């Protein structure tokens, strides 16, 4: 059985929440070892505030890269059928040819750093026409000013937002869900190797 995706508990834990949501989306509850949950929380929330308070600046890029590499090694050991790839800079964009779109079209997900007033992590789970299906872990129950960004509460195990492509590739940090300056971008692609599809399988499916 798969669990519903969940929301962050504080103002700071969007990173580990999105990483654990990635596992919850890709795997049955019985397939997720407790070690994966423990290490996700252990490696994240590593940034200190200006006052020196741990965790109050969220999760660093270094921590996400480390966690991505750890998941890969965990998969290589055969403990869990997981694989991961860390992307940064020019590799992080939304387009028909992008690595993120390719992952979403082939059974994978992407945990992406973007902007929601401040730097923020969300989980991308799919594509619908020219929109990204994503789960934003920051609970919000008011409609957006942007009428083309849709809220969805009917797919709790998959997504809660439908966001047009056009928002993501913006470098302006003031734009909601913008990926921001190219040199600062990052994403973590994650797959369940048992459910990952290859291009040939997708083509045959649509035929």
Question: Model features per residue range: what roles?
Answer:
Residues 104-105, 127-207:
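Noncatalytic regulatory segments and standalone regulatory/sensor domains
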Residues 1-88, 203:
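Cysteine-nucleophile protease catalytic domains, especially the papain-like/related folds used
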Residues 50-55, 89-91, 144-152:
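Short, flexible/disordered intra-domain loops and linkers
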Residues 65-70, 96-101, 164, 174-177:
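Intrinsically disordered, low-complexity boundary segments flanking structured domains
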Residues 85-144:
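Active-site-adjacent substructure of cysteine-protease-like catalytic cores
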Residues 66-82, 112-127, 149-160:
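Hydrophobic transmembrane alpha-helix bundles
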């Amino acid at each position: 059985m798969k669990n519903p995706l969940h929301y962050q508990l504080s103002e700071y834990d969007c990173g580990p929440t999105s990483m654990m949501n990635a596992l919850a989306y890709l795997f049955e509850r019985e397939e997720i070892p407790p070690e994966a949950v423990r290490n996700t929380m252990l490696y994240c929330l590593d940034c200190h505030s200006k006052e020196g308070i741990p965790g109050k600046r969220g999760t660093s890029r270094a921590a996400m890269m480390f966690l991505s590499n750890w998941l890969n090694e965990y998969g290589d050991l055969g403990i869990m059928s997981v694989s991961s790839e860390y992307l940064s800079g020019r590799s992080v964009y939304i387009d028909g040819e992008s690595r993120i779109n390719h992952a979403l079209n082939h059974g994978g997900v992407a945990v992406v750093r973007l902007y929601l007033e401040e730097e923020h992590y969300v989980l991308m789970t799919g594509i619908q026409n020219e929109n990204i299906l994503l789960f934003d872990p920051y609970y919000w129950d008011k409609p957006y000013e942007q009428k083309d960004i849709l809220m969805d509460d009917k797919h709790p195990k998959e997504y809660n937002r439908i966001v047009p492509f056009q928002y993501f590739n913006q470098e302006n940090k003031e734009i909601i869900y913008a990926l921001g300056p190219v040199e600062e971008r990052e994403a973590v692609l994650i797959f369940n190797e048992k459910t990952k599809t290859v291009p040939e399988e997708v083509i045959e499916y649509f035929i």
